[in-house]
Amino acid sequence: MNASISLLCFALLLISPFCLGYSDEERESDSLRVAEILQTSKDDESKINRTQELLDIFRRLAPSLSPEDRERIERSIKEHTDEILIDGVPSQGGRKTKYVGKILSPVAQGLAIGFFEELGGSLSRLFTG
């Protein structure tokens, strides 16, 4: 009895990583969502407000990317986001855009829109190949 429970636990440990991956359905859904965000974000405010959603899509996609693609996009993200700290320690995956919900000067607004377009374009290229 004890051996069968141990064997079952071992089998679950071997199978569990395959259940945590980024499925083709999720990838297709995120691809369509990125395209929708880019097409429907016509004004500056909507671009700035939807940047966080693009960041969330990148977080889901990141483990399935090549190290080069991930690093390239993460460099850009680090320039334009603030790290979320909990008790002075960065939270796991904790970054938020610097621009959402703030009154921005024209220069900062231009940076925020440029970041939205850069991130959206990078994600779109990753999905379309």
Curated annotation (Swiss-Prot):
The lineage of its organism: Eukaryota, Metazoa, Ecdysozoa, Arthropoda, Hexapoda. One of its GO terms (biological process) is cellular response to UV. Pfam families: Turandot. Residues 1-21 form the signal peptide. Belongs to the Turandot family. The keyword S-adenosyl-L-methionine does not apply. Keywords: Immunity, Innate immunity, Secreted, Signal. The keyword Cell cycle does not apply. It comes from Drosophila sechellia (Fruit fly). It comes from the Eukaryota. One of its GO terms (cellular component) is extracellular space. It is found in: Secreted. InterPro entries: Turandot. A humoral factor that may play a role in stress tolerance. This is Protein Turandot C.
